[in-house]
């Protein structure tokens, strides 16, 4: 019997002349392709596509699907990624014919239902975040970051303040923060984290000056800790003339409990594909709406979706706008799923989401703190970090622990991030997991900790039960093979 590890590439299954699908005979006169397309668009040779049967295709991709791990197949505690369950009612709504069969180029009067839905989503997100207006254009979180920073840049330039070229970013921040700042034309400046895992206010005062355009923060931060001094940080940045930017990657911890706008943030982006259950992974699609306070509204990407006395339309008469940042108006399908989720949960339900996410994370942290080092002992929010320093002294690295978890059927947590925690493991259980699931994962982690003491080679050589063992990750990163060269069959 063929084992899963022997699954061939789809190209390797190809057999010349094998047919997967056939088309009916033409009932009109056949036209040469050259008469239908300009010569520049006609291939000189047929594309080298695999020739396989429908049955082969089904078996091939079914076999591959069994090698995938997703939220629907098991616990996925990937820190800072909010791998929560995506309710299937979202998919039902997203497949309604009246919503599926619209086109962005249809006249506005023909798609009032869809535009009303998008406008209602904007309004809901503005209320949830404490912002004045929201754009749904950005396609993902980093895209939202860049969009927000471009608006901040436009704001400063409109005020003749072109010397503001620096964005302050904590040393525990997501890597997208300094990257987005660079792409937006800023220089990133790092502010230290103190011993409590929070922004060092004294150092923040040192690095903020008349060249500071913005401070980018997640709250809770990437260590899963709430920045309790956030309003003082807002005062520091605002007194210097800068803006406070909220990276909404960790919004799952504060829904219905706290709003960035009330903390002093001027710009917010959200990840609808995370917090609001648009499915994510595999490269997208995502959705990264951006909300702003009133003084930044003129710089929103255009067109701006507005409610004109009950008629929903796109307004392009925005002379100070940073311009369009995406074709059409955002990723419609993900926005629709997020709207469905918000309407399904309601205000009380969204608050319960965050309460349960925080409860689950704290429960796991307290159960595991006796077996792994806990860098920050205070209560966490939606996620927490452990350190494998104790196991490293026994010859077992955090990478080994992550690989060993695969043998138990779990996707490992995020490892070696944030960078300011040695042998870091970042765990985010989300609110959708039961106590039974959490307990099973905890027991696996405890067993691995004991194995590190009693039989470290068992962990060092893991995984033992997966189809693929350890990869040469350096070779894969430096010399990836991203295309298949088909071999010509000889007759």
Curated annotation (Swiss-Prot):
Q: Does the keyword Oxidoreductase apply?
A: yes
Top-level EC class as recorded in UniProt = oxidoreductase
Keyword vocabulary terms for this entry: Oxidoreductase, Pyridoxal phosphate
| Cellular component, GO, one term | glycine cleavage complex
Q: Which residues carry this modification: N6-(pyridoxal phosphate)lysine?
A: 274
Q: Which GO terms describe its molecular function?
A: glycine binding; glycine dehydrogenase (decarboxylating) activity; pyridoxal phosphate binding
Q: List the catalytic activities from the record.
A: N(6)-[(R)-lipoyl]-L-lysyl-[glycine-cleavage complex H protein] + glycine + H(+) = N(6)-[(R)-S(8)-aminomethyldihydrolipoyl]-L-lysyl-[glycine-cleavage complex H protein] + CO2
Q: Which family does it belong to?
A: Belongs to the GcvP family. C-terminal subunit subfamily.
Kindly provide the name given to this protein in its UniProt entry: Probable glycine dehydrogenase (decarboxylating) subunit 2
Q: Which organism is it from?
A: Shouchella clausii (strain KSM-K16)
Q: Which gene encodes it?
A: gcvPB
């Amino acid at each position: 019997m063929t084992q899963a590890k022997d699954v061939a590439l789809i190209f390797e299954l190809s057999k010349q002349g094998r047919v997967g699908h056939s088309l009916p005979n033409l009932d009109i006169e056949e036209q040469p392709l050259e008469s239908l397309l300009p010569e520049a668009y006609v291939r000189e040779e047929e594309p080298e596509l695999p020739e396989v049967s429908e049955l082969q295709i089904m078996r091939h991709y079914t076999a591959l699907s069994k090698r995938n791990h997703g939220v629907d197949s098991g616990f996925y505690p990937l820190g800072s990624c909010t791998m929560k369950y995506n309710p299937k009612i979202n998919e039902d709504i997203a497949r309604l014919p009246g919503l599926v069969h619209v086109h962005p180029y249809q006249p506005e009067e023909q798609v009032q239902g869809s535009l009303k839905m998008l406008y209602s989503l904007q309004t809901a997100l503005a209320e949830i975040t404490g912002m004045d207006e929201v754009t749904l254009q950005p396609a993902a979180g980093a895209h939202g970051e860049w969009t927000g920073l471009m608006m901040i840049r436009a704001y400063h330039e409109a005020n003749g303040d072109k010397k503001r070229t620096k964005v302050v970013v904590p040393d525990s921040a997501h890597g997208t923060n300094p990257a987005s700042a660079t792409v937006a034309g800023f220089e990133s400046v790092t502010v230290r984290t103190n011993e409590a895992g929070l922004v060092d206010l004294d150092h923040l005062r040192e690095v903020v000056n008349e060249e500071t355009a913005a401070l980018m923060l997640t709250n809770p931060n990437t260590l899963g800790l709430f920045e309790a001094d956030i309003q003082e940080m807002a005062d520091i940045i605002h007194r210097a003339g800068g803006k406070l930017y909220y990276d909404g990657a960790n919004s799952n911890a504060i829904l219905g409990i706290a709003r960035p706008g009330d903390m002093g943030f001027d710009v917010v982006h959200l990840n609808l594909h995370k917090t609001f259950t648009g499915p994510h992974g595999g490269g997208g699609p995502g959705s990264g709406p951006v909300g702003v306070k009133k003084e930044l509204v003129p710089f929103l990407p255009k067109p701006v979706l507005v409610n004109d006395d009950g008629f929903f339309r796109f307004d392009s008469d925005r002379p100070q706008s940073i311009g369009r940042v995406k074709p059409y108006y955002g990723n419609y399908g993900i926005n629709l799923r997020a709207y469905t989720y918000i309407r399904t949960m309601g205000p009380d339900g969204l608050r319960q989401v965050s309460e349960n996410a925080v409860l689950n994370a704290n429960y796991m942290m307290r159960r595991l703190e006796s077996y792994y080092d806990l860098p920050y002992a205070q209560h966490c929010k939606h996620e927490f970090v452990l350190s494998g320093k104790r196991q490293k002294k026994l010859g077992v690295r955090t990478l080994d622990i992550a690989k060993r978890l695969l043998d138990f059927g779990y996707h490992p947590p995020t490892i070696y991030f944030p960078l300011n925690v040695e042998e870091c493991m970042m765990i985010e259980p989300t609110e959708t997991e039961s106590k039974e699931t959490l307990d099973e994962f905890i027991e696996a982690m405890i067993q691995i900790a004991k194995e590190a003491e009693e039989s470290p080679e068992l962990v060092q050589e893991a995984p033992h039960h997966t189809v693929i063992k350890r990869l040469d990750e350096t070779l894969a990163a430096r010399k990836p093979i991203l295309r298949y060269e088909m071999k010509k069959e000889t007759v």
